């Protein structure tokens, strides 16, 4: 996600999730509760970052991750671990919510007296990612960029709705860009194939993959049905607009899957190389090359004739 300077509190809130996730995993592996105390303090910093939508996403992700391991422990009949995990979640909520309560209560009181108390769906879906934005995974500026002043030597964002494009305005470049680097993309598919062909299932690839895809579909907002379901049936989601702000969950989860692939390449090169082979690399490189050429030669833009009107 690319952030407006005026939206830095969004970044200041979301940035704590990877560290909280790391601490929670350390607790799972060691059963040492001081990691949970640190995780609670970390999530407190997420709340104090001052962007409610983002810290709600952070808590939901961490809660789902805890449920995933609670289910795994229950399935393996490790009741002691189940109890420990439930207690750990309660501790995180108490520490983070307790320390930041002075801000939470004030924020809730303010929201009850603001115009966003009863927002409609038309307002809530503002800032939706479009399925066409998936192309930004390969070329981040494929639709141009947010040209912040007349002297900036950048390609202006051209695919805007008033010209027949797919996005509501040039500012959507800061929300709808999904780029996580080509290096990460190279490893994602081999990592998934390796996981399903391996007996070792310690890495929660299925969890990250499913949650990441749900986050992506949610970010589509008014361009897909998932966001409307959350808006209608799940508390708090009718308080927020800009569903595209959830894309950091997609970025993180698929980045972790790519990291898993890199780890397997170093630890089990012979097996992993069956999936990260020359044939795959040639296909991937060729696709990216053709896609890049289509961008720089203007062929891609010519497929959107109305965007230049």
Where are these regions (language model features)?
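Aromatic- and kink-enriched transmembrane "portal" helix at the membrane-lumen/periplasm boundary
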Residues: 1-11, 44-48
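Hydrophobic, membrane-inserted alpha-helices
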Residues: 1, 18-19, 38-44, 184-188, ...
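Contiguous transmembrane helix-bundle modules in multi-pass membrane proteins
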Residues: 7-15, 27-41, 53-54, 60-61, ...
């Amino acid at each position: 996600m690319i952030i407006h300077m005026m939206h830095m509190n969004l970044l200041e809130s979301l940035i704590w999730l990877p560290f909280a996730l790391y601490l929670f995993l350390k607790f799972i592996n060691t059963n040492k509760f001081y990691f949970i105390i640190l995780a609670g303090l970390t999530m407190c910093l997420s709340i104090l970052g001052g962007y409610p939508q983002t810290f709600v996403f952070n808590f939901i992700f961490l809660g789902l991750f805890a449920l995933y391991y609670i289910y795994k422990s229950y399935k393996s009949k490790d009741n002691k671990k189940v109890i420990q995990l439930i207690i750990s979640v309660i501790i995180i909520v108490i520490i983070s919510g307790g320390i930041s309560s002075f801000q939470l209560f004030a924020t809730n009181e303010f929201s009850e007296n603001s115009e966003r108390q009863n927002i409609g769906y038309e307002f809530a879906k503002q800032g939706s990612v479009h399925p066409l934005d998936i192309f930004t995974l390969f070329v981040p500026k494929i639709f141009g960029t947010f040209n912040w002043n007349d002297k900036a030597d950048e390609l202006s964002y051209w695919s805007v709705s008033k010209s027949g494009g797919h996005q509501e305005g040039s500012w959507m470049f800061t929300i709808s860009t999904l780029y996580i680097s080509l290096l990460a993309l190279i490893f994602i598919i081999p990592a998934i194939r390796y996981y399903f062909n391996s007996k070792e299932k310690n890495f929660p690839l299925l969890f990250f993959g499913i949650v990441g895809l749900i986050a992506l579909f949610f970010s589509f907002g008014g361009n897909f049905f998932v966001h409307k379901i959350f808006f209608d049936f799940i508390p708090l989601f009718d308080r927020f607009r800009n569903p595209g702000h959830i894309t950091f969950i997609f970025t993180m989860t698929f980045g972790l899957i790519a990291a898993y692939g890199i780890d397997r390449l170093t630890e089990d090169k012979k097996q992993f190389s069956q999936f990260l082979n020359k044939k795959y690399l040639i296909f991937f490189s060729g696709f990216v090359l053709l896609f890049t050429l289509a961008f720089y030669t203007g062929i891609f833009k010519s497929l959107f004739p109305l965007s230049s009107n």
